[in-house]
Amino acid sequence: MALSVGTTAPRFTAQDSEGNPVSLSDFAGKTVVLYFYPKDDTPGCTREAQGFRDSYTEYQNKDAVILGVSTDDCTSHQLFKQKYELPFTLVADPDKSITKAYDVDGGGYAKRVTYVINGTGVIDQVFTTVKTDTHAQDILAGL
């Protein structure tokens, strides 16, 4: 069961695709779209990532940050980002600590769930049913 609207988003620090540290607190004051997905370079996950890529400018115009999280490692994320020219940050969670903190552990992978976190670190929206082809636009409509 995913975390609820109104809950303070769990803080985390992990590595991005380049091995650099990334923390939720790095984006204080901004809307963060924290999207969890099962696996790099698989059909549904690729469509979802491409949707965020194609809408990236619209997210920037709304001062929103996109963070994609899966249990893949940094190298896998780096290859996925390069292959599909993804302009946003992918967060590696191989130890599943973030996945578990956000209650989206699918038993070895992250469930496809998205949290919209406001600038004060509170969850404003939760998407537990995701249509990978339209998900990025569905979220934008509510920002």
Where are the language model's segments positioned?
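Chalcogenol-based redox active-site neighborhoods
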Residues: 1-143
